[in-house]
Amino acid sequence: MCSSAAASPALDDIEEGIALRPKFDAAGLVTCVTTDAGSGDVLMVAHMNAEALEKTIQSGEAWYYSRSRKRLWKKGESSGHVQRVLEMRIDCDQDAVWIRVDQAGGAACHTGRKSCFYRRIDRDASGEPLLTMVDAERQFDPDKVYGK
């Protein structure tokens, strides 16, 4: 892997080459979209630094970088709901990663839901945005799992 601090490779090499050369942002992160390998549903969007990306590739389990906690974390380290990576892809610019996972425990979201995307943006009668719960059934009680 190549860090963003290294010399910039040619655009053609980034878009068409076979070398992994992730383009980390100023904070040293790439966006990661995680989907359920079976259903194709989006489970979550998170971030990876170089270490999280490397650990994910090497271990076959999803690792992320928490911007709020400012630390590396393995998905499922507290809940047991690990994500086994079945496929990883990187986009054309190599600045975003997509991983397809087998989600243990049936829930990816820290709220106990299958997906972090459990609210749809609709409009009320006056045209104002309104959030509607969809696919919002909890798979686990976050208070019991995380002790909040």
From Swiss-Prot:
GO BP term, example: L-histidine biosynthetic process
Family: Belongs to the PRA-CH family.
A cellular component term, taken from the record's GO annotations: cytoplasm
InterPro entries with a match to the protein in the record: PRA-CH, PRib_AMP_CycHydrolase_dom, PRib_AMP_CycHydrolase_sf
Binding of Zn(2+), residues: 92, 109, 116
Job of this protein: Catalyzes the hydrolysis of the adenine ring of phosphoribosyl-AMP.
Molecular-function annotations in GO: magnesium ion binding; phosphoribosyl-AMP cyclohydrolase activity; zinc ion binding
Annotated protein name in UniProt: Phosphoribosyl-AMP cyclohydrolase
Keyword list, A-Z: Amino-acid biosynthesis, Cytoplasm, Histidine biosynthesis, Hydrolase, Magnesium, Metal-binding, Zinc
Taxon lineage: Bacteria, Pseudomonadati, Pseudomonadota, Alphaproteobacteria, Hyphomicrobiales
Source species: Rhodopseudomonas palustris (strain HaA2)
